[in-house]
């Protein structure tokens, strides 16, 4: 089987060092296994997209020595998401977030996990006729389990209790992240999804959506997020310095790659020299994979 991986940034601003580290690891994974590597711009939320961010992202990746075999934009694939949505058991929902949280607070149970679980208010068809409607997936009465191929951890979620009916199309017509990423990974032939650990808890619902659409879920590998000196994850919204600052100030890309490698938790990366190329890191990632039978 040919491995296909991907890096899927949102062009809502400039890449920061945390994005660069995830991009590096995704590239190392694809190339260490002799596979294809895709660049996919997740640009469905057009209100937040910045037109200049596409080219800036490409320049930053090329500066680091990271290449890709094919490029995609989600904004050019809307018909595929519409077709997938039509094949799923969904229903209209006119609940606001405030109403959802109020319904949960009034119920006997508390929210499960890190986010509020939709209580099913609109499931019987009781929608507000004067509001635009989102589309929610009526999740099956089933458990969805995912084993992380990197850590070996397994996460199981009972979909109705732990996830709830979740939005696949917003009330403004924008297709939701979970639908688009599942359709894209399946139709692009992505076999291995390496991404940040913040998306670990989303993996069971995405695996369930893969199966509901007749696809085989990919292997998931979740890597630690890069934090600042306060222990907070780097984020565009949090004002993390853009990677382009290092490039524009004449910093050598090899030094940036070495600095990123030194932050990784696996043996060997902390010992790389002060300057290194991306291909020179491939054997180290190969060593990481060799210790994990799931990869």
From Swiss-Prot:
GO cellular component: cytosol
Keyword Nucleotide-binding included in the entry's annotation: yes
Pfam families, per database record: tRNA-synt_1c
Protein keywords: Aminoacyl-tRNA synthetase, ATP-binding, Ligase, Metal-binding, Nucleotide-binding, Zinc
A biological process term (GO) from this entry: glutamyl-tRNA aminoacylation
UniProt xrefs under SUPFAM superfamilies: Nucleotidylyl transferase
Residues that bind Zn(2+): 93, 95, 118, 122
Chain ranges for the short sequence motif 'KMSKS' region as given in the UniProt record: 233-237
Sequence motif: 'HIGH' region, positions: 9-19
Residues binding L-glutamate, per UniProt: 6-10, 42, 177, 195
Note accompanying the cofactor annotation: Binds 1 zinc ion per subunit.
PANTHER family xref list: GLUTAMATE--TRNA LIGASE, GLUTAMYL-Q TRNA(ASP) SYNTHETASE
Role noted for this protein: Catalyzes the tRNA-independent activation of glutamate in presence of ATP and the subsequent transfer of glutamate onto a tRNA(Asp). Glutamate is transferred on the 2-amino-5-(4,5-dihydroxy-2-cyclopenten-1-yl) moiety of the queuosine in the wobble position of the QUC anticodon.
Similarity field: Belongs to the class-I aminoacyl-tRNA synthetase family. GluQ subfamily.
Protein name from the UniProt record: Glutamyl-Q tRNA(Asp) synthetase
Lineage start: Bacteria, Thermotogati, Deinococcota, Deinococci, Deinococcales
